[in-house]
Regions:
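N-terminal small-residue-enriched
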Residues: 2-513
Length: 513
């Protein structure tokens, strides 16, 4: 398994927090200045049930265990303001359909950006070439269905203009500059999307979802005494412009300013193996990357994950519980349904130290026999866009509260560090070996926090780190920022969180003393 670069959070990583390439505009006859209709695929492109049935028949003409058509239409708007000047303002559209058919262990997949009958039928025939059997029975009728309403908005972002967005961005810049005279440069970027999805399944369901999202990134540069320091913050949700209340904006600015200014007094810690307290919130990036991916079912189905034969076995202390939950209202990782049309929900991966389950798509759920006798798996099949196949993916992944307090954990550290904010790293998904870069943290000596630290490398192994968690606090926090996870060449938004937790030992890359 190749090592891969983790896509970090915040404005400095906004090039990594990019949306898919928008390769196709809507037809000239469509007035995209108007609000999107309830079903744009029908109203804009004439994709009705009869056409869906025709394409599905072609897709499954040589056999199918299951199949789906995944239609997507997505608008994205980006505004970037640097030191009071709008340096970027763009609006893009992507649209298309992905077609998949599964026969046994074989998957046929094709996509087209052209939502006309000829292009879709041609793509269906391409995907169907994997099979050579008798055609599947296509339902005579597709039943409309919705799986939830976890991120309803008063107004979609496609109806919010620059006259409302620019004052919001200018307010954030003014708040940052007023926070401290050392703040020298301020960059604010607002990215919003209005996405429509329509999924037609061989099982006869026709599912729709409207997925809003917004992410504000803030990057600050401060100057003091001949030194220059930079840091960042971000705040995102599946919500509308009303999400950015004065209280939330103040919290975003205060956090970013604090993270930046503390770097003037920070130093690198001593290098070596020592206890590491993972701070509540963003430290869950380590949990997500170094541990969570190993619990995705595709890696376990093919035996490349260290957890492949560990179901029912202890992987952590009894006070450690790890959950992936895709139905937390308005979180960026939340989905009403996954990209196969299955309902999302709460999947307990580690329950009181015991590995209980993996994250599944339809293919792995069938392999593990989960969807039998009326049972259904928690939907975790995701894709970056219609151009990509389905993979089991995390949504909102977190560790639950434990029996300790943060103060008790700090007091238990004789010589170690607190890792507070992360800006990137690498991980080998199967084995879980990792290197993470800590931007902000604290030195702990004799059970007391003694100094801020910066620019720290954490080196270790995810499954081993999970086993070495000896204390978990009761200060759980979901990180409010925007995170994008990369896997198999696909990037999807996720949410992360955890309480403070103590890893008894980890290799810290600092200064040799």
């Amino acid at each position: 398994m190749k090592r891969r670069q983790f896509l970090a959070t915040g404005t400095a990583g906004l090039a990594n927090l990019s949306l898919p390439a928008f390769l196709c505009a809507a037809p000239a006859a469509t007035d995209l200045s108007q609000p999107a209709p309830v079903n744009p695929f029908l109203d804009w492109f004439g994709i009705d049930e009869a056409l869906i049935r025709r394409v599905m028949s072609e897709l499954t003409a040589r056999g199918a265990d299951f199949a789906e058509l995944y239609f997507q239409h997505k608008r994205a708007n980006v505004i970037r303001m640097q030191d009071g000047i709008a340096s970027q303002a763009s609006s893009d559209i992507m649209q298309g359909v992905g077609l998949r058919v599964v026969v046994g262990d074989q998957t046929g997949f094709a996509f087209t950006e052209d939502l006309n009958p000829e292009s879709m039928l041609r793509a269906a025939r391409t995907a169907a070439t994997i099979a050579s059997g008798q055609g599947a029975t296509v339902p005579a009728h597709f039943d409309p269905k919705r799986q939830g309403d976890l991120y309803s908005v008063e107004r979609p972002w496609s109806e919010v203009g620059l006259d409302e967005k620019l004052p919001l961005i200018r307010k954030v810049e003014a708040m940052a500059r007023a926070a401290d005279p050392a703040i020298d440069k301020v960059t604010v970027r607002l990215t919003d999307t209005d996405e429509r999805v329509l999924i037609a399944t061989l099982g006869g369901h026709l599912l729709t979802d409207r997925r809003p999202s917004v992410l504000m990134g803030l990057q600050l540069t401060a100057k003091r005494g001949g030194q220059t320091q930079s840091n960042l913050g971000s705040l995102g949700a599946r919500s509308d412009i009303g999400f950015y209340t004065d209280r939330r904006l103040k919290d975003l600015v205060d956090e970013a300013v604090s993270r930046t200014l503390v770097l003037f007094d920070a130093r690198r810690p001593p290098a070596g193996e020592m206890p590491v307290m993972l701070a509540a919130g963003a430290s869950s990036v380590l949990l997500h990357e170094a541990i969570g991916h190993g619990m995705e079912a595709d890696f376990n189905r093919i035996g490349t994950s260290i957890y492949s034969d560990m179901i029912g076995k202890p992987v952590a202390e009894s006070f450690v519980t790890v959950v992936d939950q895709g139905d937390l209202p308005h979180e960026l990782g939340t989905l009403n349904m996954d990209d196969e049309g299955n309902a999302t929900g709460r999947a307990v991966l580690v329950d009181k130290g015991i590995l209980k389950s993996y994250l599944h798509d339809n293919l792995s759920a069938r392999h593990y026999g989960l969807d039998r006798d009326g049972a259904t798996h928690v939907g975790s099949g995701r894709r970056e866009s219609y151009r990509f196949p389905i993979l089991p993916r995390m949504t909102s992944t977190f560790m639950e509260n434990g029996p300790h307090t943060r103060d008790e954990i700090v007091a238990a550290i004789d010589r170690g560090i607190i890792a507070e904010t992360f800006t990137g790293g690498q991980v080998a998904i199967g084995a879980g070996d990792f290197t993470f870069y800590v931007k902000n943290g604290w030195l702990v000596e004799g059970g007391k926090i003694t100094a801020p630290i910066k620019d720290v490398n954490l080196i270790g192994n995810g499954p081993e780190a999970l086993k070495r968690i000896t204390m978990v606090a009761n200060d759980f926090k979901l990180d409010p920022g925007g995170w994008v996870c990369g896997k198999g060449g696909q990037n999807v938004p996720v949410s992360i969180g955890m309480p403070s937790a103590l890893v008894s030992r980890m290799t810290v890359g600092g200064e040799n003393v």
